């Protein structure tokens, strides 16, 4: 197996779990991170300890220059990319829309939406048979928030993830005949650090009763869905939005 995978936002949570699982499946993994080098290197160390191949590359996915430099380095050090997980994302403190600043909105959309578009664009340039590539697979990490709306908390984040759903559907149709499958997962209430960064560290515990399965999910459970979508086992699956939300 000579599959080269880039996981953006791969230093923690769903991204880290995906990188670790994919490495166990035989992927050579590039762990992208924005600022937490120590966490990214820990993921790389764990992959290497298990006999896998991995490297950590810093890049702010909202910065086109940094994205171009990251992909150029992957080309040089690993070869042609065959798989991408667009996982990098941020959420802010709970607020109503009428309280949100332009600065907040720009940050949410720059990282969650523009970053995903930039990385998808560069991946397609390398994977597409139209560009001489071997084909490949892209999985975008959306959110159940894209259909729930997150009122009085994160409507901006929910809207950004709605854009990711449309990116998934449109791009899947655009490159389906060029050897590339594009899918998304929609995680629900998942026990990761993103809740603390959004000001609600106990959110999973407090909302678990709203989930039909009566619990939050784990990053590893989301990673299982992502890695399946990347794999040949999902060879006829594209344009899908896979719910990993416990039924909520």
Language-model regions, residue ranges each:
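Catalytic Tyr-X3-Lys loop
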Residues: 82, 98-117, 139, 164, ...
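Conserved glycine-rich cofactor-binding loop
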Residues: 11-12
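Catalytic loop of short-chain dehydrogenase/reductase
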Residues: 90, 133, 139-163, 168-177
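A short, exposed helix-loop element centered on a Lys and neighboring polar residues
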Residues: 120-121, 169
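C-terminal substrate-recognition "lid" of short-chain dehydrogenase/reductases
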Residues: 215-244
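Active-site Tyr-X3-Lys motif and surrounding loop/helix of classical short-chain dehydrogenase/reductase
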Residues: 69-76, 95-99, 103-110, 206
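Short, small/polar-rich loop/turn modules that mediate ligand/substrate recognition or access, typified
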Residues: 176, 181, 237-239
